[in-house]
């Protein structure tokens, strides 16, 4: 039987790693959009630097 990879499981499982990668890609795209729309890096936009 094939393992369901979209189920949310805690720990180092293949499903959890898939979700981690998907959420990391969304965060990276959000950082790129913030930088391109504001002309500042994410840390400058948030006032950290």
Swiss-Prot record:
UniProt keywords, alphabetically: Chlorophyll, Chromophore, Cyanelle, Plastid
GO MF annotation terms: chlorophyll binding
Keyword RNA-binding: no
Main location: plastid
Annotated GO CC locations: cyanelle
Entry's localization field: Plastid, Cyanelle
Keyword Plastid belongs to the record: yes
Domain of life: Eukaryota
Annotated family: Belongs to the ELIP/psbS family.
Protein task: Possible role in chlorophyll and/or carotenoid binding.
Name of this chain's protein: Uncharacterized protein Ycf17
Organism of provenance: Cyanophora paradoxa
Gene: ycf17
